[in-house]
């Protein structure tokens, strides 16, 4: 059998306008949307479905053409000035943020017709040239600022940042390193620092002696007997005399004084806690 030749459908401008408007809303309309659209533009649902298939294929083709341009566009976080883009009511639903991730985004292109895309491309090209000009001007300004800060300026000028003494000092420091072709890691070029490990150890020893007192002071870490209240009182009296002497002594660290007072308070609390009626009763019996 001979195949029946398919008649090519021709669309009017009104039909194409309605179809494009529906395509901007969604690329994949459901059966109800297609039937409603077919009734409005006097077409069959099958013709509308075929048109959407062809339109999606055309959109993918244009997307592949535009895709390489995204790699060449410089990334910029500066938003696009809306005054540079020609006002168009169909562009109101497009969110323009930056050329690297929004203008060539397929989701945003779905809501823009082909004619509007050409206008967008022209606007983006103009924006890219403006962006390059701005970066060039900022680089020139930075270079000028660096030149003003460099120490090779004449020190006689009123805008000189470094004085003669500072330049002389820097030359004296850098001079030995320029003369030697090879830097040797020895004491000749790297003299021992003020805070060497040995000096740090010595400092730590002196600090240790300044914090920890001599053996003449009472060691409160040794626990006293619970029932020996006389020894506790003697220790308290001795500690009070010791604290008065330590206040006069400037070598005692303040933190050590604080720990001593805390220990005294702890011993007082421990002595008071153990001085229960039962302990006093046993003490009276032992005294008799």
UniProtKB/Swiss-Prot annotation:
User: Which keywords does UniProt give here?
Assistant: DNA-binding, Homeobox, Nucleus
Which Pfam families is this protein grouped with? Homeodomain
The transmembrane residues are none
The keyword Nucleus is annotated on this UniProt entry? yes
Q: Which domain of life is it from?
A: Eukaryota
Is Repeat given among the entry's keywords?
no
* GO MF annotation terms: DNA-binding transcription factor activity, RNA polymerase II-specific; RNA polymerase II transcription regulatory region sequence-specific DNA binding
Q: Where in the cell is it found?
A: Nucleus
Q: Which residues bind DNA?
A: 4-63
- Which InterPro entries does the protein's record reference? HD, Homeobox_CS, Homeodomain-like_sf, Paired_Homeobox_TFs
GO-annotated cellular components: nucleus
Q: Which SUPFAM superfamilies match?
A: Homeodomain-like
Into which family does the record put it?
Belongs to the paired homeobox family.
Its name, as the record gives it, is: Homeobox protein SMOX-3
Q: Which organism is it from?
A: Schistosoma mansoni (Blood fluke)
């Amino acid at each position: 059998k001979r195949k029946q030749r398919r008649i090519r459908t021709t669309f009017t401008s009104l039909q194409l306008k309605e179809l494009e408007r529906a395509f901007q809303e969604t690329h994949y309309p459901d059966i109800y949307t297609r039937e409603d659209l077919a009734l409005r533009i006097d077409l069959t649902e099958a013709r509308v479905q075929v048109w959407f298939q062809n339109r999606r294929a055309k959109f993918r083709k244009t997307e592949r053409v535009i895709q390489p341009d995204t790699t060449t566009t410089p990334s910029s976080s500066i938003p696009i000035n809306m005054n540079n883009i020609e006002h168009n009511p169909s562009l109101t639903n497009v969110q323009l943020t930056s050329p690297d991730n929004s203008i060539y985004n397929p989701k945003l292109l779905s809501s823009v017709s082909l004619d509007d895309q050409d206008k967008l491309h022209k606007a983006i090209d103009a924006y890219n040239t403006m962006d390059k000009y701005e970066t060039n001007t900022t680089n020139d300004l930075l270079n000028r600022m660096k030149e003003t800060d460099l120490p090779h300026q004449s020190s006689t000028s009123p805008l000189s940042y470094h004085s003669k003494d500072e330049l002389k000092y820097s030359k004296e420091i850098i001079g030995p390193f320029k003369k030697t072709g090879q830097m040797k890691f020895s004491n000749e070029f790297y003299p021992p620092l003020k805070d060497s490990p040995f000096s740090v150890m010595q400092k730590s020893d002196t600090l240790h002696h300044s914090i920890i007192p001599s053996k003449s002071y009472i060691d409160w870490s040794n626990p006293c007997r619970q029932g020996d209240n006389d020894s506790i009182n003697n220790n308290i009296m001795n500690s009070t005399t010791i604290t008065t002497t330590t206040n006069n002594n400037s070598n005692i660290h303040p933190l050590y004084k604080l720990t001593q007072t805390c220990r005294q308070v702890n011993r007082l609390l421990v002595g008071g806690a153990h001085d229960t009626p039962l302990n006093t009763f046993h003490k009276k019996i032992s005294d008799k």
